[in-house]
């Protein structure tokens, strides 16, 4: 039996209704209802981030690490409750792993060598605005880890969270933006 477009739409509507997804808030701490608005805000932020020193970016990352540790249990419980996947104890450990082991600016190094053919210099530079689709498994861990890496490199990011993990994802994004504001 061939599947028509209307059948696909009916299936999508049925699945979304079962998930009972609330509308996302708009514009507060980097949460937008429309993707284009999020992209425009990230472009504006990118103009600031790319001018930041490595020390400034590391200061934000340090604040993010602190906030992850302070909120690990809350995010773990939210993730398990919202998605029905995983267990709280393991997710708490994963959040601490993200806070303790995710590389920051220390991995952004300059390499240079010279020889008979001249000087070669390799320096890392930002890509700009990065788009990321996040999973329903480990939503907050993914957002937090990816942000620290992207920020270390001087980039900004727009996340499109999985609908089954929207509340947990919004919590993590708010936490990141609070850390950025608190760090100056």
Task: Locate predicted features.
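N-terminal Rossmann-like NAD(P)+-binding subdomain of aldehyde/semialdehyde dehydrogenases
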Residues: 3-121
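Rossmann-like NAD(P) dinucleotide-binding subdomain of oxidoreductase/dehydrogenase enzymes
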Residues: 110-184
């Amino acid at each position: 039996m061939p599947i028509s477009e209307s059948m696909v739409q009916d299936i999508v509507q049925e699945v979304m209704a079962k998930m009972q997804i609330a509308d996302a808030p708009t514009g507060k701490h980097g949460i937008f209802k429309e993707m284009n608005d999020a992209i425009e805000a990230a472009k504006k932020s990118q103009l600031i981030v790319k001018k930041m020193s490595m020390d400034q970016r590391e200061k934000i990352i340090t604040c993010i690490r602190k906030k992850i540790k302070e909120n690990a249990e809350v995010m773990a419980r939210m993730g398990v409750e919202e998605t029905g996947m995983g267990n709280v104890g393991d997710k708490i450990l994963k959040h601490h792993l993200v806070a303790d082991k995710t590389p920051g600016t220390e991995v952004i190094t300059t390499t240079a060598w010279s020889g008979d053919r001249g000087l070669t210099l390799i320096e890392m530079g930002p890509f700009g605005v990065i788009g990321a689709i996040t999973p329903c498994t480990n939503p907050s861990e993914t957002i937090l880890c990816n942000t620290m890496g992207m920020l270390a490199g001087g980039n900004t990011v727009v996340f499109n969270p999985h609908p089954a993990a929207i509340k947990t994802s919004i919590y993590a994004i708010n936490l990141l933006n609070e850390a950025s504001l608190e760090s100056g």
